Amino acid sequence: MPSKAFETLPNIYLVGPMGAGKTTVGRHLAELLGREFLDSDHEIERKTGATIPWIFEKEGEVGFRTRETVVLNELTSRKALVLATGGGAITQAPNREFLKQRGIVVYLYTPVELQLQRTYRDKNRPLLQVENPEQKLRDLLKIRDPLYREVAHYTIETNQGAARDLAQKILQLILSNKLK
């Protein structure tokens, strides 16, 4: 049963590359906190009635990022939420501002090898539909890692335990710093 102490915590936002486990860890974290869990990519699909690959195909990445910013502004304005963001959400300055100013941001750092292992069969990741997905992941991480670190209040490595354990570790880290 969630503690009363959790009620005073701000929203918690998970950022990181595709395959980091943001959705899985986020669900466990929300369960520990007794909070609603949302995934921004799922919310974009729900609100538009279109899949992310379709949006990328018809509107390009720019169109998708525009939709993503609208949804993130809306979601980060809510309360008592654990939110998993899309891997590229931090590429847009307004999104970084929404996240950093409206809650606690946790960067789930994931080595490229683990990202590849977790995503190589997933056809719903438009940015990986290329000849060399491993190189694409390396290129994305090189660009995005500094942005994840810029926005994050905490960084956790995801190759250190199961999703439930990572959620517990995140909660302990946040609570121990809140008590200081």
UniProtKB/Swiss-Prot annotation:
It comes from the Bacteria. Substrate binds at residues 41, 65, 87, 144. Transmembrane segments: none annotated. Its EC number is 2.7.1.71. It catalyses: shikimate + ATP = 3-phosphoshikimate + ADP + H(+). GO terms for biological process: amino acid biosynthetic process; aromatic amino acid family biosynthetic process; chorismate biosynthetic process. InterPro entries: P-loop_NTPase (IPR027417), Shikimate/glucono_kinase (IPR031322), Shikimate_kinase/TSH1 (IPR000623), Shikimate_kinase_CS (IPR023000). GO terms for molecular function: ATP binding; magnesium ion binding; shikimate kinase activity. ATP binds at residues 19-24, 125. Its cofactor is Mg(2+). Pathway: Metabolic intermediate biosynthesis; chorismate biosynthesis; chorismate from D-erythrose 4-phosphate and phosphoenolpyruvate: step 5/7. The keyword Isomerase does not apply. PANTHER family: SHIKIMATE KINASE (PTHR21087), SHIKIMATE KINASE 1, CHLOROPLASTIC (PTHR21087:SF16). Monomer. Catalyzes the specific phosphorylation of the 3-hydroxyl group of shikimic acid using ATP as a cosubstrate. This is Shikimate kinase. It comes from Acinetobacter baumannii (strain AYE).
